[in-house]
Each structure stands twice: as C-alpha cells, then as structure tokens.
Amino acid sequence: MNKGKIKQIIGSVLDIEFENGELPEIYNALEIEATVSGKREILIAEVQTHIGGKAIRAIALSSTDGLIRGQEVTNTGKPISVPVGDATLGRIFNVLGKTIDEGPAITVKETRPIHRPAPAFDELTSKTEVFETGIKVIDLLAPYIKGGKTGLFGGAGVGKTVLIQELINNIAKQHGGFSVFAGVGERTREGNDLWREMKESGVIDKTVLCYGQMNEPPGARLRVALSALTMAEHFRDSIGTDVLLFVDNIFRFSQAGSEVSALLGRMPSAVGYQPTLSTEMGALQERITSTKKGSITSVQAIYVPADDLTDPAPANAFAHLDATTVLSRAISDKGIYPAVDPLDSTSRVMNAQVLGEEHYTVAREVQRILQRYKDLQDIIAILGMDELSEDDKVLVARARKIEKFLSQPFHVAEVFTGAPGKYVKLADTVRSFKEVISGNYDHLPEQAFYMVGSIDDAIEKAKGYKG
C-alpha cells in the first residue's frame, strides 16, 4: 500500500507528502491511525487537490484531534465506500457508512463508492405521475411528482423538519416504500427525535438514516448526502423499487462546501460561497433521478438565509426542482400549520392534462380567491370591511375559511398539539375545497375549518360551536 507523511495540519485540512511520487487520485480515501482520548482510531481523509511536487491536500472527515506532523498516512486506492442493501434498513450511519446507533454489527454483503456518475440519458424515464402526500395544501396547490424533486423552502423555525417527518410517516404507512434520510448539518436533537419517533411508529424498518450533524467537520457534512444517495441508488437499481430520499438540509450541503472551499484556499464568489457551488449542486442533483429500473422521489428541506430567496444557495437549488413548497413566516405567525404559502408554492404538474379538469379548476379558483383577499388587505386595514362591496365581503369570508382549512393536524405533532393527525386522500381534498369555494358552507364559523381533515370533519366540528 502506498504510504505518505503528514506535513501540515490546519483545522480539517491536511497536507500530505508521498516520497515515492505515487500520488493518490482525487477523491481517494486516506487512512490515518491516531490516538484520541487514549484510544487508537482510524481517521479517514479525502484527497481534494494535488498541490505540486509530491504533495496532496486532503480534507478530514472527522476530528483531527490527536494528529501530529510526520504521522504515517495510507492510501486506500479507492473512494469512500458505504454498505448498501437490506442490511442497512432500520439503522443509522455516519458519512463513512459506520453504524452510530449502538446496535449490533451489520453483515455487509456489498459496498459502493459514494462518488459515481449520474445515470446515462438512455436509462432515464420521463413519465409524469402525481404523488399523493395526504397533506391538503400540497396535494391541492403544489402537487409532488413521483420520481421528481421537491424543495421545502423556509427560514429558521417555520416547520421544515416537522413537514419532512410527516411526509416520512405518511409515505411509510400509506405507500410502504423504502425511505432514505440524509441529515446534513442539522441539529443532533432533531436526528435523535426522528429516530425515536420512527421506532415508536414502526416505520424504522423501511428506512435508512444517514447523519452528518452540525457539530461534525465540514468534510463530513459535505459528503453525507452522497453517502445517503448511494444507499438510495442501490434500492432503485438493484431491487427496482421506488425510493424516497429526504435531505435535511440541502443548504447545509452548500454551506459545508463553502467551508471546505475556504479551507482549501479557493477564491470565494458571490456572498462568500465557493466558486464551484453550481457544479457541486449539479453533481448531487443529477444522480437523484428516475431510471427505467425504479424511481427516486426526493424531498429536500432548503433553509433560506434571512428569508432571502435570492441568496445563491437556495437560488441554485431552485433550478433542479419540479415542485417548490414555500413555508411562510407570515402564515406560521397566524398559527396556521403547515405554514405553506399557497400563492408562492409551485409545481410543474399544475395543469389539467396531468391533474384532471376538476382538480385543476378547483386549485386555480382557491388561488384566485386567496390572491383577491391578499389584494384587498390594504383596503381592509385602512377603511375596514364595511367599505367593501357585497361580493368582496363574501369572498373575504370565504378566503378566511380557505386559509384556515389549509391547516392540518400532523401525526408527528400529536405529542405537542394533542390533536390526532389526519391523512386526507387527494379525492377528498378536491371534493372538500370544491364545496367550500362553491359557497355550500358559508354558514359555518371559520373556526370550524381550523386544524381539521376533510370537509366532513369541519361539519362535525361546527356542531360543537352551535351547541
């Protein structure tokens, strides 16, 4: 095995010299034996650049504590590889494919390198089919696509992770498919909560969790999405199933790339991001696709720094998405959850050919009513409701009911709200909103529409107010 020596350590960046001049290839994994807290551990680093002469620069994928100059480094001759297949189900892995849930050791039958080319054009499939989530506002106004990519955009604390947890819960229970969850640079507490909730709800056996949390070095946060994607690709290609890939949070992937880029001494571009931002995002997103063997449907939470959608990181992710679910702070401030913005959220399948005439007409009418209500806000604020025409008064009352009706109790939030979660089928969603916009339930109090499932639940709730 080819061996080198550490020449310099700056944080997570290692400069390593190979005396014989046989340099490892870019992205090869290097092994370094280190003593951490009195224990011998193998540290893995990944080759990033050849810096001239016989030296390379690598980024460590775990803490560099305990490393010293002159230490021996071994070139493994291949990129980082992670275990794939049924043995991974129900377990938590780190970026290197090691289990971190303190469970029994897994029997690895097959491993795959995390750096792989995207599928060729002739392997791709392009059929369009709506993916039912059971969440009213999404299914009605910004439907997801089977085998498509969806972005959940939102600032801090508007409910991206809760929405992802509900989607995992609904999909496991209603669709029975495999899910792969990539925790990229998010809170360890949330990762722990997700694991416990999955165990309690019984969906863990159909899920693989792959975590690179906030406290880990940038190299681990940058590569953990690729580790999770490699596991998802195996389910798609070898087993031929429809897989769900959840990434929380894709912004942290770009952020980690920015940190690595700065550590490697590259010139920053706009807003301090790495010059290779769109290349890195493209390399990841092009692999998340559907082939003739199976599909990967991906839902990616995208943190929006300072609620600015024009920031280069979220703006770069936009280009790859089929549907966008925008979470709004103004809506969450009203206490409406999920805080999905019905006017800002979009979907590429929002047309009558895919959705059917009835669904499309109802969705557009709901958006028209909400848009008109938004336009009238200034008049209402300055002059009051009395200055509106009779038609507008009816429309505003209906819009307020629709706004409340777009809220929904979640299964994963039962412990916080005490309200049992509701899964609403697409047909029930369309039927319910059709009846609301046609004025059949204008006589019901608007509070009856808050945090319910279908229109039948709202009618039942209204009986309690009358009593």
Swiss-Prot record:
Annotated membrane topology: Peripheral membrane protein
Catalytic activity annotation: ATP + H2O + 4 H(+)(in) = ADP + phosphate + 5 H(+)(out)
Localization of this protein: Cell inner membrane
Keywords: ATP synthesis, ATP-binding, Cell inner membrane, Cell membrane, CF(1), Hydrogen ion transport, Ion transport, Membrane, Nucleotide-binding, Translocase, Transport
EC class (word): translocase
Major localization class: membrane
NCBIfam families: atpD (TIGR01039)
Physiological role: Produces ATP from ADP in the presence of a proton gradient across the membrane. The catalytic sites are hosted primarily by the beta subunits.
Protein name, entry field: ATP synthase subunit beta
Residues making up the signal peptide according to the UniProt record: none
InterPro entries linked: AAA+_ATPase (IPR003593), ATP-synt_VA_C (IPR055190), ATP_synth_F1_bsu (IPR005722), ATPase_a/bsu_AS (IPR020003), ATPase_alpha/beta_chains (IPR050053), ATPase_F1/V1/A1_a/bsu_N (IPR004100), ATPase_F1/V1/A1_a/bsu_N_sf (IPR036121), ATPase_F1/V1/A1_a/bsu_nucl-bd (IPR000194)
Similarity comment: family membership: Belongs to the ATPase alpha/beta chains family.
Keyword hit for rRNA-binding: no
Binding positions for ATP per the UniProt entry: G154, G155, A156, G157, V158, G159, K160, T161
Source taxon at top rank: Bacteria
EC number(s) from the headed UniProt entry: 7.1.2.2
Oligomeric and partner information: F-type ATPases have 2 components, CF(1) - the catalytic core - and CF(0) - the membrane proton channel. CF(1) has five subunits: alpha(3), beta(3), gamma(1), delta(1), epsilon(1). CF(0) has three main subunits: a(1), b(2) and c(9-12). The alpha and beta chains form an alternating ring which encloses part of the gamma chain. CF(1) is attached to CF(0) by a central stalk formed by the gamma and epsilon chains, while a peripheral stalk is formed by the delta and b chains.
Molecular-function annotations in GO: ATP binding; ATP hydrolysis activity; proton-transporting ATP synthase activity, rotational mechanism
